[in-house]
Amino acid sequence: MSEKILLIDGHSILNRAYYGLPNLTNWEGLHTNAVYGFLNIMTKVLEEEKPEYLAVAFDLHAPTFRHKMYDAYKGTRKPMPEELREQVPLIKEVLTAMKVAIVTMEGYEADDLLGTIAGMAEKKGIDATILSGDRDLLQLATDHVLIRIPKTKGGKTQIEDYHAKEVLETYQVTPAQIIELKSLMGDTADNIPGIPGVGEKTATKIIAAYGSIENAHEHLEEIKPNKAKESLRDHYDLAVLSKKLATIDTESPVEFSWEDARMGNLYTPEAYDYFKRLEFKNLLSRFDQQETEQKALPSWRIVEDFAEAENIWKQAEQAEQIGIAVIDGMDGVRGVAVALEDQNTVYFPVEGFQTEGVLCGHLEQLFAGDSQIGAWDVKAIRKKIEIPERKGIFDLGIGAYLLNPLKNDYTYDDVAKEYLGEQLPSQEEVFSGMKKPDPKKADNEQVAAYGAYQAYVALHGKDTLKKALQEAGMWDLFEDIEMPLVFTLDDMEKEGILVKGEELKLYGEKLEVRIRELEEKIYEEAGENFNINSPKQLGVILFEKMKMPGGKKTKTGYSTAADVLDKLAPDYPFVAAILEYRQLTKLKSTYADGLAGYIGADGRIHSTFNQTITATGRISSTEPNLQNIPVRMELGRLIRKVFVPRDGFVFLDADYSQIELRVLAHLSGDEMLIKAYREAQDIHRMTASQVFHIPFDEVTPLQRRNAKAVNFGIVYGISSFGLSQDLSITRKEAADYIEKYFATYPKIKSYLDGEVEKAKTDGYSLTMFGRRRPVPELKSSNFMQRSFGERIAMNSPIQGTAADIIKIAMIRVNQALRKENLRSRLVLQVHDELLIETAKEEVEQVSAILEREMRQAAVLSVPLEVDMHTGENWYEAK
């Protein structure tokens, strides 16, 4: 059986993969979809072909002999999208790492190189397969040269195969005559002119009858139809030129080494590193463990013997480095896994002499010691045992989050692949056989493996993550802010916030009464009953029955989105009633009804605070989300009345005043803004005075309100369109406001533009405390995506710095309350606001702590101001 070579048209397959797959980026913001698709197609064909040789040919960004022949050659091609362009050198790097021969030559196209090498192969008795999305290469098909063309059908990649026989059957011409077809019909993709008025059908008839353009020209009077005859007579020179342009040069002087092209092991250690970096998880499974110097799976054992267990715990107490995983069961802890450097990882199940209390007691001793401990979700472990707030405890999920805040999840197998170069079974693989992986219901062996792998990565991954954080300039952020925050958030979650259940019920009933009133009013004005919550039915009522302006019909009906209704509401009370109805029904379902389900036996709601969710570093809250309670409408604000302190306590609410604008003043160094804050001026009134060129004392409330919208909008990189929507003014007026604003504060404009440029260069934005936020959107060729990326680049340093400052303040306030042995506790954080459940006799002391710690959380060129209020409920305190 003959040997075989697989030849790949690099740009063609990369281009096809790019347009065939959705946008993918890795943690660095590198676009990877074309590279990923290319490798998938290549590996599929390699498995089918099993060649002895492999080479990939690429075009160079330089003129070829065809450009010298015809200036307009390929002149109509659109520029390559930036997201694809950046993947060209990347695929070459990956292929080089895989030891794949790459062929390029100045002055020639990849087609010429592929044709030449295929010809070499035939002469050597080697079969050739050419993989390309370009049908021009069909001219190369013979009995020993196979052209394979991938195409997508029904969302799946299928490959059409052409030897010479299949070309004749499909196109009614021989492979060599494909060139003749192009001579007559041209090729719009390559801007080969052909002759006017002749398409594929006519060209095929002519070439099938006469074999070549030369012979057809000799029999010109026989050519039909007349239009084609006249065109060939008048433009024969174009046909000859087109033939030269369409002919692949199979005698190009390419330097090609058969030895370099011989297939070896593609899955090298270098390739493995690339696949890890690019996050090609599905492809990592192809790597042979020996070839990639991959370690065997970490061994582990279940410990059930008392003497052995005691011995291991003693060793753990003396160990310098420990990895820990705690596995939850149906009711409490199910088991504990411990990894030590000198021995295998062990798993202690909760059974027999190893009660939950015994295991938790051992864990408490370890955390209380001075060992360096790596663990997953320290906050969750602290719910089960006492863990002192100290250095040397490393939460791997938080470390991984800081290094890539755009990911949705941070799992042990991801960290093992990314940072240890090891492939461990994922949670889904460990719990194979279960529809949904659940350690609470799995068998003991599966749970032991799951815990052991986590502990192993916790032990071996923490130092690698630490090094990565240090190299990224984020170690101080991790050690001084994010890890101490774990303890503060845990304290807040345990404390919870008291809710008056009866008040909540009454609030819901009050909402229900108003909702029913609105329903009746809406039905009466509409003249019929309909489903108010149905956009389709509402759209018909508004824009067909009531003939309101601005109706935009989509495939599913008229849009009744908030932005559409907001424009109509001032002039149509019916629409205002619809908007109020929507707001109140959401309030009732989300808060009046929703919050009731979260009230615990102690009468308190214990929300979960997340620090690894948002890309900017802001804390979020879930189950329930207490950070999203409405503030704009009075009925929404009233929900805060159900949150109350315990007897003998009041709420003390401390809120940073305009923290993001103050951060902007500091980061931009704008003298006028800094001066205004140092002199405690009304910043919005001052902005209105400067922008509208009127005396400070003559600024109207409307002008101040507009200036306020501009001030805060600038922080979020607002566009003229966005501002025009916010203020209900024309886009031109909004653009004028923004222009005047930047003329007033010129350094802000320079700063924001500079942040965008830095993010374009670095791939990420940076807060004052070193937090990185990748901005892959800046590399998009899509204008909307790129604009969004620019807004992220402007806002992330400001919002992220403000988030870091509030975290520092939270940590210090929480520590101070405990250090001074106060009964008062931090119970809630909402963006720039802290809520303290304060013992009445401690109000003065707690106020001083808040004032001190919040103002001193960061040293800025402007003062950090704090507004404080007390109240018998959250509503009064706010």
What are these regions (language model features)?
Residues K50-A55, V100, K123, T142-L146, ...:
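Non-catalytic nucleic-acid-binding/docking modules located in mid-to-C-terminal regions
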Residues D438-K440, K494, H606-S607, Q611-T614, ...:
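Conserved catalytic core of nucleic-acid polymerases
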Residues G154-K182, P298, R334-Q470, I481, ...:
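Active-site-proximal helix-loop-helix substrate-binding element of RNase H-like nuclease domains
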Residues E341, N533-E698, Y764-E833, A848-R852:
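Acidic, glycine-rich two-metal-ion catalytic cores of nucleic acid-processing enzymes
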Residues L7-I8, I130-S132, G323-A325, I393-F394, ...:
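Short hydrophobic beta-strand that contains or immediately precedes a catalytic carboxylate
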Residues I5-L6, G10, R16-A55, D71-A72, ...:
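Conserved RNase H-like, two-metal-ion catalytic cores of nucleic-acid enzymes
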